[in-house]
């Protein structure tokens, strides 16, 4: 258990907080997937070499995904061989993988069609997409902002509804790109937005019951930073003491803020911030959602992340606590996973956050359930479990959207 907690502490500590003097260069970096029956050996290598981890294990023999700089490859190979670890290469050259992924197509709106979903896009183009999408559905949508980011950007979303007065039905809130490098969530959340209108039967039925508030990029500063400076950036862009930057926005929500599922190290990727709800982005989100709760109420909240193919229920702060309606939540999560698998064969694991991925205090899902009494709340980890991790090829955007939309529809079918 101690070794797992050490790995959680080490997650991204080497590269997670310092601001680079120029754009981060990942040429020659390898991403290695390792596993072994003694996780303390992996912890030792990560600590000794000061390596970044993308993913750490819940149990012995589970995978750890490690980023290895060119100058440390030889020593990593030597130490991992001596430790008897199993190894696979995820990215032979991370820099090349990023270059391929960042082949952004010029923006030309023609509706939320396959062309848009065939590549990733810059922040400004996402804003144009949302504006154009709203204009195309002007009778049943509006642009909304939950507030301002640390650097002054609007946290922009689209509010869509069916017949009747806007805001009159219970709210469904979807957040994407809370962690800046998780680009597949941006595109998948936008795919869901599009399907609410393009899937004429199912989308219309949902809009008759709920008002949807879709925020594809809940961390705009961090997302811009990933497109301009460091593709692997996770946090927001607040400056911390000691020259490190960023708060983990999914450890900063003002509920069960302190605990083993985050850290006080301002250079760590799981830095929870100086106080509960301190980040401007968190303040904006909590204030906006409280307003919805005080109105027609919050029926569902989903925080979309990547990667690992998980669909999770409360809680993150505790591995023993369960939501009052846990049986309903588990049934909904299972229906999501079953529907996803039926589309492209993609397997999702379900269960409470703490038991399924790791302990995470100060997260959005726990806050939604216990602080504003949202009826249902989930955390998703989208594709993949294969060799790509955060740098998922754009060819997987549409399949991810297709299967996720199927899962969303199935989940709503279980909602009373």
Swiss-Prot record:
Keywords: Carboxypeptidase, Disulfide bond, Hydrolase, Metal-binding, Metalloprotease, Protease, Secreted, Signal, Virulence, Zinc, Zymogen. PROSITE patterns: CARBOXYPEPT_ZN_1, PEPTIDASE_M14. Its main location: secreted. Substrate binds at residues 179-182, 234, 250-251, 306-307. Its EC number is 3.4.17.-. The keyword Metal-binding applies. Disulfide bonds join 244-267. Residues 1-16 form the signal peptide. InterPro entries: M14A-like_propep, M14A_act_pep, Peptidase_M14. It comes from Arthroderma benhamiae (strain ATCC MYA-4681 / CBS 112371) (Trichophyton mentagrophytes). Extracellular metalloprotease that contributes to pathogenicity. This is Metallocarboxypeptidase A-like protein ARB_03789. Zn(2+) binds at residues 179, 182, 305. Residues 18-113 form a propeptide. Residues 119-415 form the Peptidase M14 domain. SUPFAM superfamilies: Protease propeptides/inhibitors, Zn-dependent exopeptidases. One of its GO terms (cellular component) is extracellular region. The active site is at 381 (proton donor/acceptor). Its cofactor is Zn(2+). Residues 263-283 are annotated as: Disordered. GO terms for biological process: proteolysis. Belongs to the peptidase M14 family.
């Amino acid at each position: 258990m101690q070794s797992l907690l050490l790995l959680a502490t080490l997650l991204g500590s080497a590269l997670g907080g310092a601001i680079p003097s120029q754009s981060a260069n990942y040429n020659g970096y390898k991403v290695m997937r390792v596993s072994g029956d003694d996780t303390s050996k992996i912890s030792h290598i990560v600590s000794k070499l000061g390596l970044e981890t993308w993913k750490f294990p819940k149990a012995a023999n589970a995978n750890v995904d490690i980023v290895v700089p060119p100058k440390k490859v030889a020593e990593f190979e030597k130490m991992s061989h001596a430790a008897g670890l199993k190894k696979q290469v995820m990215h032979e050259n991370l820099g090349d993988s990023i270059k391929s992924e960042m082949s952004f197509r010029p923006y030309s709106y023609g509706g939320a069609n396959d062309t848009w979903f065939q590549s990733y896009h810059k922040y400004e183009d996402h804003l144009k997409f949302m504006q154009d999408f709203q204009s195309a559905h002007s009778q049943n949508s509006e642009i909304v902002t939950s507030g301002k980011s640390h650097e002054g950007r609007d946290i922009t979303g689209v509010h869509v509804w069916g017949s009747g007065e806007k805001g009159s039905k219970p709210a469904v809130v979807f957040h994407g790109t809370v962690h800046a490098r998780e680009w597949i969530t941006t595109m998948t959340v936008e795919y869901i937005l599009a399907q609410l209108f393009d899937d004429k039967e199912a989308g219309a039925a949902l809009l008759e019951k709920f008002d949807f508030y879709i925020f594809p990029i809940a961390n705009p500063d961090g997302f811009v930073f990933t497109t301009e400076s460091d593709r692997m950036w996770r946090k927001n862009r607040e400056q911390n003491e000691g020259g490190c930057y960023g708060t983990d926005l999914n450890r900063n929500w003002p509920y069960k803020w302190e605990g083993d599922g985050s850290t006080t190290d301002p250079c760590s990727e799981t830095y929870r911030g100086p106080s509960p709800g301190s980040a401007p982005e968190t303040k904006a989100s909590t204030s906006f959602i409280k307003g919805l709760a005080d109105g027609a109420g919050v029926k569902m909240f989903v925080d979309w992340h990547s990667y690992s193919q998980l669909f999770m229920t409360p809680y993150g702060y505790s591995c023993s606590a369960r939501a009052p309606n846990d049986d309903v939540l588990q049934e909904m999560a299972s229906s999501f996973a079953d529907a996803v698998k039926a589309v492209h064969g993609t397997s999702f694991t379900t269960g409470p956050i703490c038991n399924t991925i790791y302990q995470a205090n100060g997260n959005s899902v726990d806050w939604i359930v216990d602080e504003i009494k949202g009826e249902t709340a989930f955390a998703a980890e989208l594709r993949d479990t294969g060799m790509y991790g955060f740098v998922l090829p754009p060819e997987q955007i549409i399949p991810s959207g297709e299967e996720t939309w199927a899962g969303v529809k199935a989940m709503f079918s279980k909602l009373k």
